[in-house]
UniProtKB/Swiss-Prot annotation:
Zn(2+) 1 binds at C151, C154, C204, C207. One of its GO terms (biological process) is protein refolding. A zinc finger (CR-type) spans 138-216. It is found in: Cytoplasm. This is Chaperone protein DnaJ. The lineage of its organism: Bacteria, Pseudomonadati, Pseudomonadota, Betaproteobacteria, Burkholderiales. The gene is dnaJ. GO terms for molecular function: ATP binding; heat shock protein binding; unfolded protein binding; zinc ion binding.
Length: 378
């Protein structure tokens, strides 16, 4: 049976870049991996896996690819080459293409020279409540977060004073063990030492063998002006410590805006309810409204109705990524007077009688409302 074209196997054109070839191989290898195909699908998947591996090994090597492009399969056939020809390479190509994938999948990477696996520390989160004014202007704050320091009892070794850690006999100090499944070999974290390569027979009673103790430290945090609810600030390296010399995680500070007694935020805009007496709404006049920058004046036109919206440009918040501030929207709430005296009631009745004599012209919706009622009941 003749071999398929290597480019056809990977599904890439002949002028594909090295990165395109690598991505195509990754996709096929994950799809046809023996662990993902069981039963009747196992054998065909294994063949396709081997085929993709062979194609990648040839096309990922510049010299082999050049020979293949010029002579086809004959150019890379070991039976057609001298002693210096390509021989079996095991899983070299697979490890090269998938080393970073499996490193991320299991949370660890091999140290330099194939040593113990190192693990990045976990990220930490911290919720910070701030006021709307603080969000608008920005602020500097101090927060208390967990920190891990070397244990003073064992000086960071994790072992009881007078004793020492021993090399793990399961993994011979490498921190990893090899697991074979058919022809495929997988490297896993040693379950005995959990990737450290060391076993502590007598743990330190202070740190329980961890070598570090948890304490608290104060961190200075700068909150940028314009930050909004739900945004996060990243503090690099202030998360949990790594394992086996791995880098620490990061700290994420999540901002939570406190409810404001006057304003509601909508992106960079602000909204507020402005109460107005029905006299001012009817006759018009100037009123004062609050803003984050102080007081501002609004001219209320005669006959203003409840729900009328007034826009004050630039009186909102300048967001973190914004070039200019948002606006303030003032929503008019016409107040109905309460606890009236008898004299005040009499005056209002007289006003009501006078308005009724004018028909619907004194009410912006009076005539249309009356017409709709007539149509409904006729």
């Amino acid at each position: 049976m003749s071999k398929r074209d290597f480019y056809e196997v990977l599904g890439v054109p002949k002028n594909a870049s090295d990165e395109e070839i690598k991505k195509a191989y990754r996709k096929l290898a994950m799809k046809h991996h023996p662990d993902r195909n069981q039963g009747d699908a196992a054998k065909p998947a294994e063949e396709k896996f081997k085929e993709a591996k062979e194609a990648y090994e040839m096309l990922s090597d510049p010299q082999k690819r050049a020979a293949y492009d010029q002579f086809g399969h004959a150019g890379v056939d070991p039976n057609m080459r001298g002693p210096g020809g390509a021989g079996a390479e095991g899983f070299g190509g697979f490890a090269e293409a998938f080393g970073d994938i499996f490193g991320d999948m299991f949370g660890g990477r091999r140290g330099a020279g194939g040593g113990r696996q190192v693990y990045r520390g976990n990220d930490l989160s911290y919720a910070m409540d701030i006021t709307l004014e603080e969000a608008a202007k920005g602020k500097e704050a101090q927060i208390r977060i967990p920190s891990w320091e070397n244990c003073e009892t064992c000086h960071g070794s994790g072992a009881k004073p007078g004793t020492s850690a021993k090399t793990c006999t399961t993994c011979s100090g490498t921190g990893t063990v090899q697991m074979r499944q058919g022809f495929f070999s997988v490297q896993q974290t040693c379950p005995h030492c959990r990737g450290t390569g060391k076993i502590i027979p007598e743990p330190c009673v202070t740190c329980h063998g961890q070598g570090k103790v948890k304490k608290q430290k104060t961190l200075e945090v700068k909150i940028p002006a314009g930050i909004d609810d739900g945004m996060r600030i990243r503090s690099v390296g202030n998360g949990e410590p790594g394992t086996n010399g791995g880098p620490p995680g990061d700290l994420y500070i999540e901002i939570r805006l406190k409810k404001h007694e006057i304003f509601e935020r909508d992106g960079d805009d602000l909204h507020c309810q402005v109460p107005v007496s029905f006299i001012t709404a009817a006759l018009g006049g100037e009123i004062e409204v609050p803003t984050l920058q102080g007081k501002a004046a609004i001219d209320i036109p005669e006959g203003t109705q409840a729900g009328k919206q007034f826009r004050l440009r630039g009186k909102g918040i300048k967001g973190v990524r914004a070039s200019y501030p948002g606006d303030l929207y003032c929503h008019i709430v016409v107040e109905t007077p309460v606890k009236l005296t008898e004299h005040q009631r009499k005056l209002l009745r007289e006003l009501d009688d006078s308005l009724k004599k004018g028909g619907g012209k004194h009410s912006p919706s009076g005539e249309s409302w009356t017409d709709r009622l007539k149509n409904l009941f006729t």
